[in-house]
C-alpha cells in the first residue's frame, strides 16, 4: 500500500508507520472522546449521539454532546472537557485535534 489513503467521507484516519499503515476509524475516535468526557468531574457524554467526528488527513474535528451536573458552571466544565478530550484523543491516536464544539444537552442533578 504505497502512500496514505483515506476515505472521502472522513470516517477513517490512516497514518504511516514504519511497518505499515495504521487505520483508526472515526467511530473509535468517537469512543475515545466519549470516554474522556466521562473522566472530567461534573460531565458525562449525552446518551444520544455523544460525538460526531470529521477527519481530514491527520486533523480531527469533534462535536460533542455532553450533560453537566447542576449547578456547576457550564462554561468551566465545557472548557475542562475540551482540554481533556483534546489531550486524550491526541495521546491515544497520535492525530491532531484542531477544533472541538461542545453542545450542552442537559443539566443533571
Cite the ranges covered by each PLM segment.
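Short, hydrophobic beta-strand segments
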Residues: 13-20, 60-68
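Generic hydrophobic secondary-structure packing signal
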Residues: 29-33, 62, 74
Amino acid at each position: 500500500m504505497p502512500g496514505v489513503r483515506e476515505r472521502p467521507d472522513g470516517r477513517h484516519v490512516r497514518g504511516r508507520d514504519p511497518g505499515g499503515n495504521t487505520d483508526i476509524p472515526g467511530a473509535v475516535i468517537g469512543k475515545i472522546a466519549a470516554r474522556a468526557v466521562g473522566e472530567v468531574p461534573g460531565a458525562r457524554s449525552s446518551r444520544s449521539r455523544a460525538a460526531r467526528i470529521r477527519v481530514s488527513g491527520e486533523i480531527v474535528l469533534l462535536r460533542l454532546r455532553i450533560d453537566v451536573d447542576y449547578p456547576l458552571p457550564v462554561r468551566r466544565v465545557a472548557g475542562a472537557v475540551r482540554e481533556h478530550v483534546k489531550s486524550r484523543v491526541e495521546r491515544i491516536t497520535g492525530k491532531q485535534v484542531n477544533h472541538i464544539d461542545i453542545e450542552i444537552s442537559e443539566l443533571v442533578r
